[in-house]
């Protein structure tokens, strides 16, 4: 597992967690959050890029994420290269059946 955070004025304003190898060659972006007031400042993009590097360095070639089905959340992930998948991992679909399941090549 890899985690990264961002601080502003000693306050944690963004955090992300990636879980490498949930399947052979597949990492899961398990958590990504940027605090209100700091969204749109590039923090999420930088965290996402760092988590991509962690997954790639672990040998994964695909990243999956289960996203809250809001336009802004799905839009963020699509701008990061994710696309909706027609075949989400069953274990993620079971945990988050209402989410939008996306994946991208690393």
Regions found by a protein language model. Give the residues of each.
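Conserved acetyl-CoA-binding loop-helix of GNAT-fold acetyltransferases
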Residues: 34, 40-55, 78-79
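Short glycine/proline-centered loop/turn elements that form peptide/ligand docking sites
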Residues: 44, 48, 69-73, 90-96
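Flexible loop residues that form catalytic
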Residues: 18, 37, 68, 85-90
